[in-house]
Amino acid sequence: DQSRGLGDVYKRQNLKRSKYKYMPFQKLKIRNKNEIVTLRTKFADPTKISGKKVKYNEWNQLIKDKDTIVIDVRNEFEVKIGSFEGAINPKTKSFTDFKSFVQKKLNKSKDKKIAMFCTGGIRCEKASSYMMMKGFKNVAQLDGGILKYLEKTPKKDSMWNGECFVFDGRVS
């Protein structure tokens, strides 16, 4: 198990474990970075503020609400292979582009209900923090991301369409 002992190093991190028939990574490298996902702004600090975490079993009800703006926070190439019904594709090439999408397309929606999701939840922590620090009032994020939703939600109840890209080349 490559992650053994990491809990001691990164106590505040919620390590996600998955079982696979093969080793998805040949080696493990740990580095401290200024930003785990790069947004390049001082207006995003999930340790101070972030969106309300919505559990997988409450997600469908939230995104079915016609007054909710549902945003896929992932990059365009990820969105193209799968997403939730009715989700907005911000058409970003990299996560840094998300700021521009918010300013150009959502700035007049600060009082609307926002529901966002990403692969495992990390980008949503940052994106929801950014939006709240920019004045959005009602921001929610899918707790554990798409991967947790797909793991826990029965197929018959799932509102997910397509595949979910994972950065080591797998799809879920």
Task: Give the predicted meaning of each segment.
Residues K11-I69, R74-G82, D168-S172:
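Flexible, polar/low-complexity N-terminal or interdomain linker segments that lie immediately upstream
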Residues N57-K64, T68, E85-I114, K156:
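Helix-loop module immediately N-terminal to the HCX5R catalytic loop
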Residues S100-D111, K126-S172:
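Cysteine-dependent PTP/DSP-like catalytic domain, specifically the C-terminal lobe
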Residues T41-K42, K80-E85, K99-V102, K126-Y130:
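A short secondary-structure junction signal
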Residues R123:
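Hydrophobic/small residue at the entry helix of a nucleotide-binding pocket
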